[in-house]
Amino acid sequence: MRTLSEVANKVKSLKDAARESDQRHRDVHDVRTGDIDTVIPGSMPDAWPRPVVANVIDTTARDTSEVMGQMPSINCTNSLQTSDRSKKFSSKRTKMANHYVISSRLPAGEQVKFCDHYLSFGLAVYSVEPDFERHTPILRVENPMGAYPEMDLFGRLKSYSRIWREEAVSLVAKYPQLIRVLKPQGSTGYDQDEGWAEREIEVCKYTDADQITMYLPAHSNTLIDSMPNPMGKLTISIAVRPSFDHEFRGAFDDAIWVYLAKSRMAMLGLEATEKAVRAPLAVPRDLQRMVFGGDSVLRTDNPDKIRYVGIDMPQFAAQEAQNMERELRLATRSPQSRSGNVDANIITGKGIEALQGGFDTVITTGQQVIGQALKRALEYAFEMDEKLWPNEKKTIRGVVQGAPFEENYTPSKDIGGNYLVDVAYGFAAGQDPARAIVAMLQLRGDNLVSRDFVMRQLPMEIDVVQMQTQIDNEQFEDALK
């Protein structure tokens, strides 16, 4: 095990090496939340502290992550199993894997959050942790901002560090021994006037195969807690968006600057319109008395010289706004058809298909990477369940493919060292369900693929063994009628 000093020095080195990546993450986060002034100070006037155009970065990230965040098919069976005993054993493990997913609330929005992190920051993290109240492993989606994974030459995770900020009162509630460090000398309580309870404290958690250590970097590396890793391995599964330079690059690192330019152009246009409405009034010299209001009478010998001072708008302003809109769509790889805006010139099947082509590849690539991360996380969950609660008899309940199930299992007996699980989005990943099903029916109709293959590639959650058994029973009952 490393000493606290060695851990602190290592985390500091990882943080220094990821300085540019951290800045990109902060910029994307601030743009999505509308804090433009923190990215480009002074760019927003006091009267309009927020952008006056739709936040295309945020809406695109939400739209893409909601499409990408559909749950894959999770199975522990394969088509080579022939005996009923092996099929029953694998079917039980399939229900266990789905129970882990349901208990982790992945179908209830956590998977969409994971995909959002993958798109926005180029890094998404599953942390497999034990829930000692329910006695089950949980796949927790962790915020990758401030996360520093260390990988070897082959892409395997060696250590994982994360730094975040938390209020002092929350830390003291979790770790009472920290009150001596965080509470100032002479302080008598938690009064707001003292202010220490609301201060945000920097916390670091370091994990590797040997140890789990938490400390306060800004308070002389004060140790919070440290323990040996009971699993003897990292139970962290990460999904890294492919990049050309091995950096964590999100999908919007470059697009935010186009959006900021578009927002600035819209603000200048709004300012020009306001100035045009409130333009000064030019009058001839012989006008002695100004009268304002409806049906006012102005006495002058030169009424044609009474006018508002106009502001000449550049002719290319509208064209530049359209160019920025087009560049922003290219940068985010999101077609206009996703928001319902389709140019009348391309309202054909081929036109819509061409617009969706780039979007489909984003979904397909993302689901392949995320599927592998979920597969590793479920394997860690099987191993954790067997190691921490080996002989405990458990009853699990859940819903798969719309059908509720209830199963009893003992980890040491029903897992038995077999942690393999298959996570598949299907060969038609990225397509809408209707097109995917039609393509598979065509392949099945020409006997190019087996029925088992088609069932495993369906864009929905399904227990292949249970479904096939149910189909066989229904066919047998129909034959007897």
Predicted regions, residues:
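N-terminal hydrophobic or amphipathic segments with adjacent small-residue motifs
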Residues: 63, 116, 149, 189, ...
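C-terminal anchoring/interaction modules
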Residues: 1-16, 283-481
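A broad, low-specificity signal for short, low-complexity segments enriched in glycine/proline
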Residues: 84-90, 220, 289, 413-416
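Structured, contiguous alpha/beta core segments that scaffold functional sites
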Residues: 3, 9, 19-22, 115-123, ...
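Intrinsically disordered, low-complexity, compositionally biased regions/tails
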Residues: 38, 46, 73, 150, ...
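Long, contiguous amphipathic alpha-helices that act as assembly "spine/axial" helices in icosahedral shell
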Residues: 30, 56-61, 69-79, 84-130, ...
